[in-house]
């Protein structure tokens, strides 16, 4: 019989007071989009004239049509799909922000429900599932919203809408 010393199996010590001892390996969070809604076919928005290019008598109706178009939600996880329409919606949102900032009396009783509908379609959404149960703001990166280019403009529009009256 050999009397070679045997080493005990390795045992990791667990510090019950430190969350680091229980923490899983960290993975980098990728961008996610809470606005993904499966669409079978590419989204087509009908190009509309600019608000400044139509007579003032036609602007309220065109404003409502543009608000309705901005209710369309795109899949920002697929960066190559609907590029033209995503850009069109972004420019329309910019135009709407400028329009309610500059124009006096453009918001009528008829426009309020459409404004609320457009804002709610874009802002109220299901958040993406969390990658882990724990979130440490000091060490973890926040989940990035892929649709932020449109969301930022919707928030800006909503702020201008609230300030306009």
Curated annotation (Swiss-Prot):
GO cellular component: cytosol; nucleus; protein phosphatase type 2A complex
InterPro entries assigned to the protein according to its UniProt record, in alphabetical order: ARM-like, ARM-type_fold, PP2A_B56
SUPFAM superfamilies found in the cross-reference section: ARM repeat
Record keywords, A-Z: Acetylation, Cytoplasm, Phosphoprotein
Gene3D superfamilies linked to this entry: Leucine-rich Repeat Variant
Intrachain disulfide bonds: none
Residues modified as Phosphoserine: 30, 32, 34
Main location: cytoplasm
Gene Ontology biological-process entries: signal transduction
Modified residues (Phosphothreonine): 7
Biased composition (Low complexity): 30-41
Subcellular compartments: Cytoplasm
PTM-bearing positions, type N-acetylserine: 2
Keyword Acetylation belongs to the record: yes
Region (Disordered): 1-41
A Pfam family it matches: B56
Tissue: Highly expressed in testis, lung and brain.
Function: The B regulatory subunit might modulate substrate selectivity and catalytic activity, and might also direct the localization of the catalytic enzyme to a particular subcellular compartment.
Name used for this protein in its record: Serine/threonine-protein phosphatase 2A 56 kDa regulatory subunit epsilon isoform
Organism: Oryctolagus cuniculus
Recorded name of the encoding gene: PPP2R5E
């Amino acid at each position: 019989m050999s009397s070679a010393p045997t080493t005990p199996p390795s045992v990791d010590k667990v510090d019950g007071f430190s969350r680091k001892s229980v923490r899983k390996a960290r993975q980098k969070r990728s961008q996610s989009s809470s606005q993904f809604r499966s669409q079978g076919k590419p989204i087509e928005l009908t190009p509309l004239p600019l608000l400044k290019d139509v007579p003032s008598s036609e602007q309220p109706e065109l404003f409502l049509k543009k608000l309705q178009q901005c209710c369309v939600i795109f899949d920002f996880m697929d960066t190559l799909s609907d590029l033209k329409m995503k850009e069109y919606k972004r420019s329309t949102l910019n135009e709407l922000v400028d329009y309610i900032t500059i124009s006096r009396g453009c918001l009528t009783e008829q426009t309020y429900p459409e404004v609320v509908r457009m804002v709610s379609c874009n802002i109220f959404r299901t958040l993406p599932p969390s990658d882990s149960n724990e979130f440490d703001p000091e060490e973890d990166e926040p989940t990035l919203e892929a649709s932020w280019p449109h969301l930022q403009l919707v928030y800006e529009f909503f702020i201008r809408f609230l300030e306009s009256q």
